[in-house]
Amino acid sequence: MAKRIIYNENARRALERGIDILAEAVAVTLGPKGRNVVLEKKFGAPQIVNDGVTIAKEIELEDHIENTGVALIRQAASKTNDAAGDGTTTATVLAHAIVKEGLRNVAAGANAILLKRGIDKATGFLVDRIKEHARPVEDSKSIAQVGSISAGNDDEVGQMIAEAMDKVGKEGVISLEEGKSVTTELEITEGMRFDKGYISPYFATDPERMEAIFDEPFLLLTDKKIALVQDLVPVLEQVARAGRPLVIIAEDIEKEALATLVVNRLRGVLNVAAVKAPGFGDRRKAMLEDIAILTGGQLITEDAGLKLENTKLESLGKARRITITKDSTTIVAEGNDVAVKGRVEQIRRQMEETESSYDKEKLQERLAKLSGGVAVVKVGAATETEMKDKKLRLEDAINATKAAVEEGIVPGGGTTLAHLTPELEVWANSNLKDEELTGALIVARALPAPLKRIAENAGQNGAVIAERVKEKAFNVGFNAATNEFVDMFEAGIVDPAKVTRSALQNAASIAGMVLTTECIVVDKPEPKDAAPAGAGAGGGDFDY
C-alpha cells in the first residue's frame, strides 16, 4: 500500500480541519439548550443522540489526513468517557480550543515542545485547583442535581438515581435495562441476585406467578454436576429431618437426579428446588464462593477434598429467604458480616490489581451483590429511537453521580474552568517564562470555551458571557436555561470534579500531541477501478 507523507504546517493544518469538523458536530449538543444530532444507521432507524462520544465514534471523513485529526480528538472524548463516564463534549470542545490557540503560536514560529511542556504544567496546576474547589457530596439532593444535569435537565431521572444510590450504597451497582412501558421505572433488589432460574418449572411453589419462594431454607452449593441421586440422599435425609426447605445450586443436575428431586417435591416429601450456578469457568467458582460466604456455608468442591455424599448440615448455607423465578434467583441472607467484609476487601484488592476493564466491571458487580444490592433502572419511551437516546443520557447520569461521590462536585455549566482562567494567568506569569509561559496562556485562553459554547447554543454572545462570569464570585455562573447569572450550587447546576478534571487532562494531552506533530504518514487513497474493457460497449444491445 503506497503512503502519503505530509510535513510541517501542511500536516498540522490538515489535522486541524478534521478536528474542526468533529468539534463542531459535537459542540452543538452542549448545554441545556444544546441540539440533537441524527446519526444514519446502516440497518434500522436513524439514531437521535445528544451524547458527545457516540457522535464522535460515528464520524468518518473521506480525506485520510483529516480523518486522522478526527481519530485523535475522538480519543479525548473516549478516554474521558472511560475515566468518568461523562464530560465527553466538554473534552472535545476544550481540545479543539487548545489546538486552535496552539497552532496559531506554532505557525508564528514558537517551539512546539516547550509549548507542550507549558500546557502540561498548566494542566497540573488546574487539576490541583479543581481538587481544592470541589465540595464533597453529602446528601441525596446533590446526587439528584448531578444526575439531572447529566441526563439533560431531567429532574425525575436525578431523583431516581439519587434514590437508587441511597438504597444500594456507594458500592452498589445501578444497571440499565430497556423497559416494556412508556415510563422509566426503578427496581431495587435486596440481597444477592443472579441470572439463573430453576432448572425445572415443577419447583415453583406459587403456580400462578411461577415463582419458588422459600423461607429459612438450607443452601447446598457445589461446583460439580450432580449425576447420581445416591450422592444427594444423605443430605436430603438430614434436611428432611430438620424440616426446612433446601435449595441446591450446582453446575448442573442430570436427568435421573432431577427427576427424583421433582418427584419428592410433588409428593410433598421434601420442599426442594435446584438452580444452575451463575457464570462460567473461574468466575462461576468465585461467585459460588461469594454465595457460600454470604450464607455462612461451604462450597462443596473436590478441590477442597469435600464430597457430596459426606456433606453434613453444618456445611450448608442458611438464608432468610430465597426467591427463584424462571430466569433469576434472589438470596436474602443475614450472613456473618465479618466474613463478608473480608471477602469485599479481597475483591477490592483484585480490582486494584487488574488492568482489564471487563474484569473490573465483573468484580464491581460481585462487590455490589455482596455489599449493597442491585438497582435496575428500566428505561421507558414511546419509540425505539427515543429509548436509545434516553438510555445514553441515563448512562451518563449514572456515571456522573458515581464520579461525584468519588471526588466531589464543582460549579457546572463551564463555570469552574472559566473562573480558573485568571488564577492560571497569575500563576503562570509568576512561575513560568518564555515559551512555557505561552503554552500555559494557551490553556488559559482555551478554558472559557465550554462556557462560551453553552451560551452560544442558548443564543447569547459567548465571549461577553464568559467575561461577565469571570468578574463574579467563584460559585456564580451563567444558567443557560434561564439566561441568568446565579449561584451554581444553589441552582443545582453542578458537575462532578472528576468529570471536569478528566475532560481537561485528556483535552490537554491530545492537543499537546497535535501541536508537536511534524509529519503525517497516511495511506494513499486507491484509485477507483475503471470499468473493464468492453463492458461499456453496446451494453444495452444484446443479440439473441
Swiss-Prot record:
The EC number(s) attached to this protein equal 5.6.1.7
The source's superkingdom equals Bacteria
GO terms for cellular component: cytoplasm
| Keyword line | ATP-binding, Chaperone, Cytoplasm, Isomerase, Nucleotide-binding
What is its EC class? isomerase
Pfam families membership: Cpn60_TCP1 (PF00118)
Which GO BP terms sit in this record?
protein refolding
Q: Where is it localised?
A: Cytoplasm
A molecular function annotated in GO for this UniProt entry is:
isomerase activity
InterPro entries named among the record's database cross-references: Chaperonin_Cpn60_CS, Cpn60/GroEL, Cpn60/GroEL/TCP-1, GroEL-like_apical_dom_sf, GROEL-like_equatorial_sf, TCP-1-like_intermed_sf
Q: Which residues bind ATP?
A: T29, L30, G31, P32, D86, G87, T88, T89, T90, G413, N479, A480, A481, D495
Catalysed reactions listed for this entry: ATP + H2O + a folded polypeptide = ADP + phosphate + an unfolded polypeptide
Q: How does it assemble?
A: Forms a cylinder of 14 subunits composed of two heptameric rings stacked back-to-back. Interacts with the co-chaperonin GroES.
Q: What does this protein do?
A: Together with its co-chaperonin GroES, plays an essential role in assisting protein folding. The GroEL-GroES system forms a nano-cage that allows encapsulation of the non-native substrate proteins and provides a physical environment optimized to promote and accelerate protein folding.
Among PANTHER family, the record links this protein to: 60 KDA HEAT SHOCK PROTEIN, MITOCHONDRIAL
Q: Which family does it belong to?
A: Belongs to the chaperonin (HSP60) family.
What is the name listed in the Swiss-Prot or TrEMBL entry for this protein? Chaperonin GroEL 1
Q: Which gene encodes it?
A: groEL1
